[in-house]
Design a protein with these regions (language model features):
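Short beta-strand elements
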Residues: 1, 5-14, 90
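Short, conserved charged micro-motifs
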Residues: 4, 65-68, 113-120
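Active-site "cap" helix and flanking loop/linker of ATP-utilizing ligase/carboxylase catalytic domains
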Residues: 11-82, 93
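Short, flexible turn/loop "capping" segments at secondary-structure junctions
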Residues: 49, 98-103
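Short, well-ordered beta-strand elements within core beta-sheets of diverse protein domains
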Residues: 58, 104-112
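Short amphipathic alpha-helices in soluble, non-transmembrane regions
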Residues: 70-75, 119-127
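Short arginine-rich
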Residues: 124-145
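A cross-kingdom feature marking charged/low-complexity
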Residues: 142-166
């Protein structure tokens, strides 16, 4: 039998978009945290976060993830410069244009006092990006909704129960 914590997924990098949620609320200097980790003095730092809700919605070109070749090379237009929009898979060309790289293009970050408020802000931000050639973009509209959160909570409870009785 296996006892204790079980690894179900492991990265040696920041998970994306999961890390965007956490880093968006981080008040402590990330460089200071990194230096403390390297010097093995993380216990000397107080990690502080804003007490807010964050929802991140990833906007991707049609074709992702199965046909990344179709999702590549489309010129990107962002209607507004927004600090709540994080560029992901995009390439800057020599002429200054930005084209899709074939994966998640932009992450729209909604921050609010509640998850529904943050979700609404992120959803609105998805409308500021388009592809000039008319190629379709998509994103998951269910991210941050009450129904998805309820399903995820139930799955987490089930995973805990299975873990306890294995």
């Amino acid at each position: 039998p296996v006892w204790g914590p079980t690894i179900i997924e492991m990265y040696s990098r920041f998970g994306d978009p999961e890390s965007v949620n956490v880093l968006s609320l981080l008040k402590t200097d990330l460089v200071e945290i990194s230096e403390a980790i390297i010097s093995e003095k993380l216990n000397t730092i107080k990690l502080e976060f804003e007490e807010k809700a964050v929802v991140v919605k990833c906007v991707s070109p049609e074709g992702y993830p199965e046909r990344r070749d179709l999702a590549k090379g489309h010129k990107v237009v962002v209607d507004e410069e927004r600090e709540e929009v994080l560029w992901a898979s995009a390439d800057l060309r020599e002429d200054g244009s930005i084209v899709s790289g074939g994966s998640r293009l932009i992450e729209c970050i909604g921050i609010g006092n509640t998850i529904p408020e943050a979700s609404e802000k992120a959803e609105k931000l998805t409308g500021v990006v388009r592809l000039s050639d008319g190629w379709k973009l998509f994103h998951r509209k269910d991210i941050g909704t009450e129904s998805l959160l309820s399903r995820r909570i139930e799955l987490a409870k089930l995973a805990r129960e299975i873990y306890l009785y294995r």
